[in-house]
Amino acid sequence: KSLSEAKSICKEIGYPVLIKAAGGGGGKGMKIVEEEGKLESLFLTAKSEAKKFFNNDELYIEKYFKNPRHIEVQIMSGKNKTVQLGERDCSVQRRHQKLIEETPSPVITDDERKNLLEKTVKMVEQINYEGAGTVEYIYENGNFYFLEMNTRVQVEHPVTEVQTGIDIVKEQLWIAFTGETALKQSDINPRGHTIECRINAENPSLNFQPSPGTISVCHQPSGFRTRVDGSVF
């Protein structure tokens, strides 16, 4: 909440650090601080942006990794059990916003995957979570670092749906009504490789500035195992 508190935290975890808006998302209000001399100005800027975008100027600080991968695990959890639906690799980003999501991750080993999925299930079970959720991690040099848990159905959930054949929204509603998940871990049989690409209204000639306007022509891709989620027809 204060600059003095921020300095203390940064000293404890070591630079570089990432300052993030506590009530935010979508890459807004995020600042990378390479050294202590830059902390004050970036802290105040992040605080101002957090207030502007989210009406909440609280910030949190975490260790910044220079060459990380963003790996997340999809789970469905009820009073009876927790089931994992595999991981997604969301490392291709611009301005901290996801552009490409894929599963399985091309960078982690089978042993790393097994360990990650098992530990994620145990963590979710310990907090007695109910519903669909995504547990997010930073991965670097063979190590996973817990980032956050998104307690909702995420934009990239179709990647997992195509890969597993599981309707995540349907299962979320089932858990909401019954308190339990009808899935079994043995039901989850991922197949192939699935990639999702987000289409954004941006102008690449102007450093990807927002470029809203009327869509006059829309030709959507099609073909075997091709899925389009959107509001343009």
List the predicted regions and their residue ranges.
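ATP-dependent carboxylate activation and anion-phosphoryl transfer catalytic cores
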Residues: 21, 26, 33-233
